[in-house]
Amino acid sequence: MQNNNRQELQTLRDLIRYAVSRLNAARVALGHGSDNAWDEAVYLVLHGLHLPPDTLDPFLDARVLPSERSRVLDLIDRRVTERLPAAYLTGEAWLRGHRFHVDRRVIVPRSPIAELLDEGLAPWVRDPLQVERALDMCTGSGCLAILAALAFPVAQVDAVDVSSDALEVAARNVAEYGLQDRLTLRQGNLFEALPAAAYDVIVCNPPYVNQASMGALPQEYRHEPALALAGGADGMDLVRRILAAAPGYLSADGVLVLEIGHERDHFEAAFPDLQPVWLDTAESSDQILLLTREQLNT
C-alpha cells in the first residue's frame, strides 16, 4: 500500500491487519516479547494509541484520528525498516504481567526464569517466606531481581552487573516498584562487588551465546548490547566463572538457577561431571538448569 493510500486505514482492526502484513512481508525476527506477528502488531498498535495491552476487544472497530494513525504507522515503519525490537521503540517491556523500562543499554527482558520466579521456584524453595537473601547476577534491566523481590517478600535482594549503563536502567525500574529498601544494585564483575553473604537463591541470565551463533544473530538482536549476549567461543566463558565461585556464596540449602539458552550441548561438554536438574517452562525446554551448593562442591 502506497503511503498516500494509508489514510484508508480507519480502525484498529485495519491497522493491526496492515501491521501483520508488513511484519510478515519483511520477515522481521521476533522473540523480544512476541513470538508471532499478530501479537507484535497488536502491541504496537495499542501502545501507539496509548491503550493498555489487554484492551483490544472493546476498541477493535473504533476509528482512529489522523494523528493517531500517523503515530501508529511510524512505529510500524520503524519496526520494519530499522529492525528495532518493539521494546526499544516503546521504551518498555512486559514480563509475566510486569512492566519494565528498557532502552538500548540493556537487553530486552524475556528470560524464562521469570516464570519460575512467578511460581516461587517451587518445589525447590519450599517456603518463599524462608528466603532471606537472593542474588540476581548479570541483572541488566533489573527485571529478574525485581521479580525475585516480589516472589520472596522478606528477602534482601542483591543485583549485580558490570555495566553502569545497565544499572541506571535497573535503578529506574527498582524505584518504580518501590523496592529500594530491599533491593540493592551493585556494579562489579560477577561476585567481586558482593558482601560476604550466603544466598538462599541465586538466579542468573548471563551472556551465553557462542561465537558462531553471535555471528548469525538476526538484526534485531544486534541492536542489543553485545556485552550482555556474547559468551565466548562455546558460550561458557562466564558460566565457568560463575559455577566456580557460586558455592562460596550459597547457603547450605541454597540453589543456583542458571539460564543458558540453546547451549546445553556446550554446557555438557564443558561440565561433563555435573548433573543439574533441567527446568522446563511453558516457553522453554533445556534452557534453564538448577544446581545446589552440594552439587557444585563435588
Curated annotation (Swiss-Prot):
Enzyme class, UniProt record, top EC level: transferase
Name listed for the protein in its UniProt record: Ribosomal protein uL3 glutamine methyltransferase
Family under the similarity heading: Belongs to the protein N5-glutamine methyltransferase family. PrmB subfamily.
Gene Ontology CC entries for this record: cytosol
Gene3D superfamilies found in the cross-reference section: DNA helicase RuvA subunit, C-terminal domain, Vaccinia Virus protein VP39
Described function: Methylates large ribosomal subunit protein uL3 on a specific glutamine residue.
Highest taxon, organism lineage: Bacteria
Keywords: Methyltransferase, S-adenosyl-L-methionine, Transferase
Residues in coiled coil: none
GO molecular function, one term: nucleic acid binding
Catalytic activity entry: L-glutaminyl-[ribosomal protein uL3] + S-adenosyl-L-methionine = N(5)-methyl-L-glutaminyl-[ribosomal protein uL3] + S-adenosyl-L-homocysteine + H(+)
Entries under InterPro entries matching the protein: DNA_methylase_N6_adenine_CS, HemK-like, Ribosome_uL3_MTase, SAM-dependent_MTases_sf, Small_mtfrase_dom
CDD domains in the record: AdoMet_MTases
An annotated GO BP: methylation
